[in-house]
Amino acid sequence: MASTSVRAEFPDTVRTPPAPRTPRYRSVLLPLSFLAPALLLLGVWVIYPALQTVRRSFYADEDGTDFVGFKNWDRMLSDDNVHTAFKNNVIWILIAPIAVVALGLVLAVLTEKIGWASVFKIVLFMPLAISLFAVGVIWRIVYQQDPDQGLLNAGAKGIHDIFVKPGVLPDAQPGQGLSPRFALTKPIDAGGVAKLAVTGIAPENVPGGAKQAVTPKPEQGKITGVVWRDFKPGGGRPGVVEKQEVGIPGASVTLLKDGKTVGSTSTGDDGSFTFDDVSGGGYTAQLAPATFRAPWRGVEWLGPRLVTSAIILAFIWTAVGFAMVVIGAGLSAIPRDVLEAARTDGGNEFQIFRRVTIPLLMPVLTVVFVTQMIGVLKIFDIIYAIAPGSVRPDATTLAFEMWQRSFSGENRFGFGASIATLLMILFVPFLIYQLRSQRRNA
């Protein structure tokens, strides 16, 4: 029986039907539908106000209906306060971003070397959890000039008083028998008693440990004396030590003869003092100038000369935590084998940091730097919180001056709009640079 074989033949290629084409308008509408809410908010809250601000800068301050051209710009560019604001903005730009990036880099590197890095980062990052206005309120207290209130001056006063001790009678006045220089008006001989009365001392300003004043007895070959607060409640006799009149402890007393100092001593708790080995006469007892040295009043951090530097320091304290965290994230992304290869080639830690770590971190450092640059250009709230009203003209910036002219009672909206437009013009180069940098690193 003959058999037949059947050979199956397959086509060379298998053709699949083409996928249905999505209409072009649908491929455009779908992304736009997701972007529409963000674009709407961007247009309402950013683009439209920005365009209106530019338009308003060409209209009069009063009602915004009278077109004045570039008059607002002319006034702005010739205004002394705007010049000060621009100068302060330049100072901010030259100091704050560089300091923030440098400190953030150092702290980020150091935190990699310690075991409790997370706690350290949280502490430094904490200022960012509160607003700049609240930061300003905190630093306003820190910067108080009175050492009893301001933390910074309290610490400085403690160091200052170690080397230059304040006098015990900064506000005293000479009593009966004393010249304006707190010296006896009559000479005294050996064996005499010098009575140095002082007045004008409030009860709360009497040195601590003061006891009832006692007139010492004359002693041969010595000059004794007393320094006391010559005031008795209810009335008393001037120049006479009486009950309820206290001595002044710790007062410096000098003994002079022929205009030269021949001895010095200090008073006890009852105000008494003694000069030994004295002979002859013609001496003068005098309270030394150190007795009246005023206590250190503190640095005027919020005065016209230092207010901008003080505010920049507060800003750096706030921003350095952000820089440290971002740079620390960049450090953790650096391949460890690159660093190990550098060590194998004989590089020390400083060389590795300068020639390997920093170049690899440059994109991150650039982002942090530009971000801080934009932040200091629009700085406002921390200045409002820290600077007292009397020195705000010295601490002003362009953003603060814009608010000052527009919303603080002057109501010069055209003038303020011209400052705001100038700020936008200054922002543009930094924004373009940051966007290009992000695209390069993407």
Where are these regions (language model features)?
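C-terminal transmembrane helix and the adjacent membrane-cytosol boundary/short C-terminal tail
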Residues: 328-337, 415-442
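Intracellular coupling helices
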Residues: 325-365, 442
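Membrane-water interface segments at the C-terminal ends of transmembrane alpha-helices
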Residues: 39-62, 120-188, 282-293, 314-316, ...
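Transmembrane-helix boundary motif in ABC transporter permease subunits
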Residues: 93-125, 136, 141, 333
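Short membrane-interfacial helix/loop motifs at transmembrane-helix boundaries
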Residues: 18-21, 26, 39-83, 88-90, ...
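Interhelical loop and adjacent transmembrane-helix boundary motif
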Residues: 285, 319-322, 377, 383-384, ...
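Transmembrane alpha-helical segments of polytopic membrane transport and secretion proteins
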Residues: 1-34, 116-120, 435-442
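Transmembrane alpha-helix signature in integral membrane proteins
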Residues: 80-110, 307-315, 423, 427
